[in-house]
Structure formats: C-alpha cells, structure tokens
Swiss-Prot record:
Molecular function GO labels: ATP binding; proton-transporting ATP synthase activity, rotational mechanism
SUPFAM superfamilies referenced in this protein's UniProt entry, alphabetically: Epsilon subunit of F1F0-ATP synthase C-terminal domain, Epsilon subunit of F1F0-ATP synthase N-terminal domain
Organism of origin: Psychrobacter cryohalolentis (strain ATCC BAA-1226 / DSM 17306 / VKM B-2378 / K5)
Name this polypeptide is given: ATP synthase epsilon chain
Stated role: Produces ATP from ADP in the presence of a proton gradient across the membrane.
Keywords: ATP synthesis, Cell inner membrane, Cell membrane, CF(1), Hydrogen ion transport, Ion transport, Membrane, Transport
InterPro entries, alphabetized: ATP_F1_dsu/esu_C_sf (IPR036794), ATP_synth_F1_dsu/esu (IPR001469), ATP_synth_F1_dsu/esu_N (IPR020546), ATPsynth_dsu/esu_N (IPR036771)
Gene Ontology cellular component annotations, sorted alphabetically: plasma membrane; proton-transporting ATP synthase complex
CDD domains per the UniProt record, alphabetical: F1-ATPase_delta
PANTHER family listed in its UniProt record: ATP SYNTHASE DELTA/EPSILON CHAIN (PTHR13822), ATP SYNTHASE EPSILON CHAIN, CHLOROPLASTIC (PTHR13822:SF10)
Complex formation: F-type ATPases have 2 components, CF(1) - the catalytic core - and CF(0) - the membrane proton channel. CF(1) has five subunits: alpha(3), beta(3), gamma(1), delta(1), epsilon(1). CF(0) has three main subunits: a, b and c.
Length: 138
C-alpha cells in the first residue's frame, strides 16, 4: 500500500509524525482529501476536524483552528495555529464558551467585539463538530 509521511505541528507541539494512507481536512474551498500521489499544493485550513488514516486503517481525529496544509509528492505538512487531538477536547467547556460567545453577540454594539464574538462562536462550533466526528467513529 502506498503511503505518505505526515507531520502535524502547532505553535506549541508536534501532534503527529508518521506514515499515513490518507488525510482529510477542511480548506478554504471545502474539504480536501490527500492520498499518496496527490498533486503538490498549498492551501489555507479553516477551523475544523482533520482526519488522519494510518496504513493499518486506524484513524486519528485532530481539531485545527486554522493554518496551512502543504502537500509534496511524499510528504504532507500541516502547520496549525492551534491543534488538539479530538479526545482531548472538553465538550462541557466548549459548550460554555459557545454560550458565552452567543451572549456577547447579543450584548455587543461594537464592531470589533462583535467580530471577536463571531470568531469565538465559529471556533466553538468547529470544536463541537470535531467532537461529534470523533464520537461517531468510535
């Protein structure tokens, strides 16, 4: 079976390094799947779940808050702003953050604070979707 090397790195740590058979992430134009032999490219990532499948069929779900995906002939590199394994996300804290962001939207008239609340809300929703994808595959 053909494989690619993959590295997933955030500003804080390297989350994944090893061989993969497939990677699926959310780019700015929608979901992108990367298999061995994929055309080289660089794209921006949107907040959301990224799935990494190993050659033995195991799948790891990682939340990325955004970043860059680079595909080379034998290597995939993800440079994420923030990245966490899905099983490390705390659903209750994320639900609370979403409620707080929604409340901020109701109470804000300042454009800057409204944009910050919208960004926080989008991040919370993306994290919750990541948790659901992780739970559905388990």
């Amino acid at each position: 079976m053909a494989t690619l090397q993959c590295r997933v790195v955030s500003a804080r740590e390297e989350l994944y390094s090893g061989e993969i058979s497939m990677l699926i992430a959310t780019g700015t134009e929608g979901e992108i799947g990367v298999l061995p032999g994929h055309t080289p490219l660089i794209t921006l990532l949107k907040p959301g779940a990224m799935r990494v499948q190993t050659p033995d069929g195991e799948e790891e779900v990682i939340y990325v808050s955004g970043g860059v995906l680079e595909v080379q002939p034998k290597m995939v590199t993800v440079l994420a702003d923030t990245a966490m394994r899905a099983h490390n996300l705390d659903e209750s804290k994320i639900v609370e953050a979403r409620k707080k962001a929604e409340q901020m939207l109701v109470n804000q008239s300042d454009t800057v604070q409204t944009n910050a609340a919208l960004a926080s809300l989008a991040e919370s929703v993306a994290q919750l979707q990541t948790i659901r994808k992780y739970k559905n595959r388990a």
